[in-house]
């Protein structure tokens, strides 16, 4: 979800996992010059919305864990080369980073995120992905508002009311 540079040789990586929810990993090596690959981790795959298979230390109540190995679970076809898709991926990753604050796992949220990664990568039309993403994520997290159709009907009625009173 998010990467924070800690020093020249280490970064903190916030990842949302199916089993543990939001987890903080320390990844060593490859922050500036030097090697891009460290301890079985290719740093180039640590991008916003990367769907990874990871191996780390045992999660036993610690808040910071060490990542030992990572590889892509889903290899994007278009996301890596399309700047618009990359910008949307950064927006989605930042939204997830800000909204998923606790280390609680939720299979529905994890599956939704994975489906959105594939959708962002493969969809021909990406214009409305950001608003749909936020709306559907809000509903999954329990912040669901009025359905979109009702909102559009209210907006249309308000617009007609404004036009008729002018």
Please report, for each region that a protein language model flagged, where it lies by residue:
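Non-catalytic alpha-helical scaffolds and adjoining flexible linkers that form interface surfaces
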Residues: 1-11, 16-166
């Amino acid at each position: 979800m998010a990467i924070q540079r800690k020093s020249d040789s280490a970064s903190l990586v916030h990842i949302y996992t199916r089993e543990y929810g939001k987890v903080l990993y320390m990844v060593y090596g490859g922050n500036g010059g030097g090697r891009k690959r460290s301890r079985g981790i290719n740093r180039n795959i640590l991008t916003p919305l990367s769907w990874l298979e990871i191996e780390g230390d045992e999660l036993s109540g610690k808040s910071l864990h060490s990542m030992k190995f990572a590889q892509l679970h889903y290899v994007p076809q278009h996301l890596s080369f399309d700047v618009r898709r990359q910008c949307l991926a950064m927006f989605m990753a930042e939204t997830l980073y800000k909204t998923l604050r606790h280390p609680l796992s939720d299979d529905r949220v994890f599956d939704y995120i994975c489906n959105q990664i594939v959708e962002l990568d493969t969809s021909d039309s990406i214009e409305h992905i950001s608003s749909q993403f936020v709306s559907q994520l809000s509903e999954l997290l329990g912040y669901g508002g009025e359905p979109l159709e009702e909102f559009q009907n209210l907006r249309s009625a308000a617009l007609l009311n404004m036009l008729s009173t002018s």
